[in-house]
Structure formats: structure tokens, C-alpha cells
From Swiss-Prot:
It comes from the Bacteria. It comes from Corynebacterium jeikeium (strain K411). HAMAP family: MenD. Pathway: Quinol/quinone metabolism; 1,4-dihydroxy-2-naphthoate biosynthesis; 1,4-dihydroxy-2-naphthoate from chorismate: step 2/7; Quinol/quinone metabolism; menaquinone biosynthesis. Its EC number is 2.2.1.9. This is 2-succinyl-5-enolpyruvyl-6-hydroxy-3-cyclohexene-1-carboxylate synthase. The keyword Magnesium applies. Its cofactor is Mg(2+); Mn(2+); thiamine diphosphate. Belongs to the TPP enzyme family. MenD subfamily. Binds 1 thiamine pyrophosphate per subunit.
Length: 589
């Protein structure tokens, strides 16, 4: 029990301010230690009964707060349920910390209940994997407090490392007794442990030979500076990054360069609409009277762009000089043709005015294509719905986007915008845990300014498959903190809308000659869910919109009245209509 108190005390001293707990017997020492810490105001807790949802809740909290957030669970498959969130955390550089209880290691392979080999369960998806071994076993902790604290420091430093940070895992074998004799004794022990560390820290401050607490100096970057010759036709492509502030600094240096930015990137000074990216792959464009070279000579990649096939086509062109910039060791080089890698830039020269004119014209064409494509409001699709949401965004809003169609539709709607932070789980681009991520993100967003009269708004946008995949994210107990102002826009097209525009959605692949459904069965995957009833079961407010006008009205009303917890705004849209909209936007009506 004392080991749990030591570990939790050090986690808080190392920057933890929120923690997600899952019920279990083996993790009792950790859970009770966290409850005591919350009782005295040191941390805020969130309890969830589903470990997968819990891990994504912690991911959302950590993604927005940029602080390490532990998720605590018992042994066995409970730990395995954290794998999807750990994959996303490590690929996105988010400090998610899995704190798993375990049986003593001597029991592994003995047939003991709820015992699996979980020490290395996350493999390369954990940036740091540690095990307390026998240090946390009852009777050993009294003399092992210093070693336990060192393990926590190492764990948190690894998770929050600006270059190599991400998901981290501490496995904690524990042996009975797992609970204190009384809660009063628990509080007494916690006070003694904290006081002893306070005294040691104070004494260490006067002892030049004592180890000091690690401090963060100026941000280190993995790569050096790259010179960018702006006299060449240059296009910047900005994708998802670990540190938005770093990306912003790069984009400020390249402010005069045409930039295609994904919704989760900072807003560029010279935006180029993503709908027009394909035109940059054409060597010369002519209207019969005038012609212009539209292919760039060089591309500067910031972070990891993954959304647009037109961008992928450009990056595959080996005749274009590609400069890849990253603030982590992960470098985007899908086609093995990156010419230079860096973390900062030194621009020289200026962009040719003729190139800037071409880029503006191409971007305007993209904007007009989208505007014309959405001018007709029938069929009403998710693309229309996301455009309405984009128009309704205000300074200070946080936008959480589903990783499938929602983030792509947001790009069509013109994001990113100044004053609006957008996030999406694009590390592994899975739809897992999107509701839970949004709930965590919304609470961290509101917690950033606890003095605000009204909680800032978080809007999450996702399709029905993404929503249904994480319904458990709405399962928030009556004793738990919950978002004050979260609007979830659920675009319900009864199935997988993204496949309508991919190769499996071709007309000749939809149905066999005998009428057997191919596309609809395994790609369309229609749902028959009553989302109003589902929301009612979780005690969540549900609203419905069936047109552009209704959707805009409900969003405006929600903004004016203010949030009252979680509201799900279901938008009934057409799935087959997406093909028609895509053709309109592409100009091939």
C-alpha cells in the first residue's frame, strides 16, 4: 500500500494533474492513493469502467493539456485494452502513461488468476517500459522509496521528452495486503510520505552533492537548420505535428510561401485550398490564351501530412526537391526521396511573383469548386454539415475531428482557422476512442482557464461509425467530472461514407450479377441505431437536424445559450450523395 502512495506522490511531483482510474482489485493501492491525493486537492480524477475508453480519455486530456496523464488498471486483458490509445499516443507524441498493476512476477506462468505476460505488452508502441519488480511488493517499499521515485521520474521524462516522447508504461507487481487497515491510516501514511519527500527535497537544496530534480531547458530539436532558397517555386505542406508552437515558428519563417495546411496544423499566412492540390501536379496549365507552370520546384514538408491523395502524388514526384522538417525523430519520407531533413529553416531570397500569382489562382479555383459544389443543398451530405460547423466556429473554440471523413471534410471547409485549435487522432488515423478523446479534450480545454465565467466551447465532429465505435465514451458515472460545454456533431449517413469515394465504391463493384450486395455489406456497413434512445440511456442530451438551415440554427442556439454538459447533435445526411458532391467539387458534374 505504501508503494502506491510513493508512486502517486512522485507522479504528482512530476507534473501529473489529472488521472484516469479503472476499478480493480490488484490496482487497489494505486487507486486508493489517487483518491487520497484528490481528497487533499493535489489531482483531479476520472473513473471509467472500460479500459479502452479510459485510455482514450487520458489521451484527450494529455493531448490538450500537454501534461502527462496516467491511466490506471488491474492486470490481464485490462492492460491490453490500452494498446490502441498507446499506438496513437506514441505516433502523436502525446504523454499518455499506462500504470498497470500486476501479480508478483514469480506467479507468471503459474496458472494464477488474471495473469498474463504484460511487462512488454506494448512493444515499440511505448517509448519507455519500466517494471518496479519487487520494489513495490509489501514489505520492500520502506527501503525502496527512492528507487520507486527514480523510476517515476524516468518514466515521465521519457513520456514528455520533446523529441522522443509519447506513450509510456510502468508495470507494478503488487502483493497482498492491497488495502490499508483504515482510510484514516491511509491518509496518515500519505502525509508522512509526502512530508519525508518534502524534507529530503529541502535538505537536498542545501546539499551540493544531492541529486537535483530534472529541469527542462530550451527546447531541443533532433535535426539542424536547412537553408530554403525561396527564389525557387516553393510549396509548403503542413500536416500533423507533436508541437504546434514549433510548427507555427516554421510557418512564420515561411509566411510568404503558398501553404497547403491540414486542419490540425497552424493556419498559414498564404493558404492554398486543399481541393486544388491536384493542379500542382500538372506541368503547364493553359486556358488557350495564357499558360503557366504550376508544378513546384521544391516542397517543404512540416510534420506528417496524410490526408490528401494530391499531396501524396506531389511527394512521389522525384523531380521535385523535398525538404522534410520534423520536431521529432520521425521524418515523413514515404517515397524515399527526401533530399534534406531539418528542424529549423533559414530562408533566403523571395518567391517569384509569377509563382505567387499561380498559387493564388489555383487556390481560388479550389475555393470556388467547393463553394459551387455545396451551393446545391441536395443531397444533404456530411460535407455540407461540416461546412456549416466550420462557418459557426468562433475564436477560442476547440475542434475535435474524427480521423476518417470528418477531418477531410474540415479541410474542404477551409480549415485551419486562426483562433481555433483543431485536433484529431491522426497518428495512426484510427476511429477508435473518438468520443472519449473528445470528452478528455473538452475537460482539459475548460480546465485551462478555471476562472472563466463560462466554459469554452468544444465541438467534436464524427460520423456514425466512429460514434458507435466508442459509445462507451458517453458512459460517465454520476460521481465523475464531465465536460461543461461539449457539442458532438454526429453526421449520420448510416455507414462508412468514406468508402463511397474510394475504389470499392465504384458502380461495377457494388453488386454481383445475381443481386448479392458486395459494397453495402462489407464497406457501406449500414447501421440501424436509434441514437436518440442511445443518448437517453446515457443521460446525454440529443438534438436532431435534417438540413443546412436546421443545423446552423441549432449550433447558433447552443453557442448563445451556452453548454450544459454534453449535447449530441445528430445530423441526418445522405451517404450515396457524397459521390455526387465529390464530382461537383472536382468540377466533373
Amino acid at each position: 500500500m505504501r508503494a502506491g502512495l510513493v508512486l502517486v506522490d512522485q507522479l504528482i511531483r512530476s507534473g501529473v494533474r489529472e488521472a484516469v482510474l479503472c476499478p480493480g482489485s490488484r490496482n487497489s493501492p494505486l487507486n486508493l492513493a489517487f483518491v487520497e491525493a484528490e481528497r487533499v486537492g493535489r489531482v483531479r480524477l476520472h473513473v471509467r469502467t472500460d479500459e479502452r475508453s479510459a485510455a482514450f480519455l487520458a489521451l484527450g486530456l494529455a493531448k490538450v493539456s500537454r501534461r502527462p496523464v496516467p491511466v490506471v488498471m488491474t492486470s490481464g486483458t485490462a492492460v491490453a485494452n490500452c494498446l490502441p490509445a498507446m499506438v496513437e499516443a506514441t505516433l502523436s507524441g502525446v504523454p499518455l502513461v499506462v500504470l498497470s498493476a500486476n501479480r508478483p512476477l514469480s506467479m507468471l506462468g503459474s496458472g494464477a488468476n488474471q495473469t498474463i505476460d504484460q511487462a512488454e505488452i506494448f512493444g515499440t508502441h511505448s517509448v519507455c517500459t519500466l517494471n518496479t519488480g519487487e520494489l513495490a511488493l509489501e514489505g520492500a517499499a520502506a527501503g525502496a522509496a527512492g528507487e520507486l521515485r527514480d523510476l517515476v521520474r524516468k518514466l515521465i521524462n521519457a513520456a514528455t521528452d520533446p523529441i522522443d516522447g509519447g506513450g509510456a508504461h510502468l508495470d507494478v507487481p503488487l502483493r497482498e495486503p492491497l488495502v490499508p487497515p483504515t482510510l484514516d491510516e491511509l491518509s496518515l501514511w500519505a502525509g508522512e510520505i509526502a512530508a519525508a519527500e518534502d524534507a529530503a527535497t529541502t535538505e537536498g537544496a542545501h546539499d551540493s552533492h544531492a541529486p537535483s530534480q530534472p529541469t527542462r531547458g530550451p527546447r531541443k530539436l533532433p535535426y539542424g537548420q536547412v537553408e530554403v532558397d525561396l527564389s525557387r517555386r516553393t510549396l509548403v505542406i503542413a500536416g500533423s505535428v507533436s508541437d504546434v508552437a514549433w510548427a507555427r515558428s516554421i510557418m512564420d519563417e515561411l509566411a510568404d510561401v503558398p501553404t497547403v495546411a491540414e486542419p490540425v496544423a497552424p493556419a498559414p499566412d498564404f493558404p492554398v485550398h486543399s481541393a486544388a492540390v491536384d493542379m500542382f501536379s500538372t506541368q503547364v496549365v493553359s486556358d488557350g490564351e495564357h499558360s503557366a507552370v504550376t508544378i513546384p520546384e521544391q516542397i517543404v514538408v512540416i510534420g506528417r501530412p496524410t490526408l490528401h491523395r494530391g499531396v501524396t502524388k506531389l511527394l512521389a514526384n522525384k523531380d521535385i526537391n523535398v525538404i522534410a522538417l520534423s520536431d521529432t525523430r520521425n521524418v515523413t519520407d514515404v517515397f524515399d526521396n527526401v533530399d534534406e531533413v531539418g528542424s529549423t529553416v533559414r530562408p533566403r531570397g523571395e518567391q517569384p511573383e509569377s509563382w505567387l500569382q499561380v498559387a493564388r489562382a489555383i487556390s481560388d479555383m479550389g475555393v470556388n469548386q467547393v463553394r459551387d459544389g455545396l451551393a446545391e443543398r441536395e443531397p444533404f451530405t456530411a460535407v455540407h454539415a461540416v461546412a456549416v460547423v466550420a462557418d459557426a466556429l468562433r475564436d477560442g473554440d476547440l475542434l475535435v475531428l474524427g480521423a476518417s471523413t470528418a477531418v477531410r471534410d474540415a479541410s474542404r471547409a477551409g480549415l485551419p482557422f486562426d483562433g481555433v485549435q483543431a485536433i484529431a487522432n491522426r497518428g495512426a488515423a484510427g476511429i477508435d476512442g473518438t468520443i472519449s478523446t473528445a470528452v478528455g479534450a473538452a475537460m482539459a480545454h475548460a480546465h485551462a482557464d478555471p476562472t472563466a465565467i463560462r466554459a469554452p466551447r468544444t465541438i467534436a465532429v464524427m460520423g456514425d461509425l466512429t460514434f458507435a465505435h466508442d459509445l462507451g465514451g458517453l458512459n460517465i458515472g454520476p460521481l465523475e467530472p464531465r465536460p461543461d460545454n461539449l457539442l458532438i456533431v454526429l453526421t449520420n449517413d448510416s455507414g462508412g461514407g468514406i468508402f463511397e469515394t474510394l475504389e470499392p465504391g465504384a458502380e461495377n463493384l457494388r453488386t454481383f450479377a445475381d443481386g448479392t450486395a458486395a459494397f453495402e455489406r462489407v464497406f457501406g456497413t449500414p447501421l440501424d441505431l436509434d441514437f436518440a434512445e442511445l443518448c437517453a440511456g446515457f443521460g446525454v442530451e440529443h438534438k436532431l437536424a435534417t438540413s443546412v438551415e436546421e443545423l446552423a440554427t441549432v449550433i447558433d442556439e447552443h453557442a448563445e445559450i451556452g453548454g450544459s454538459g454534453i449535447t449530441v447533435l445528430e445530423v441526418k445526411v445522405s451517404r450515396r450523395g457524397r459521390q455526387e458532391i465529390e464530382k461537383r467539387i472536382a468540377g466533373t458534374r
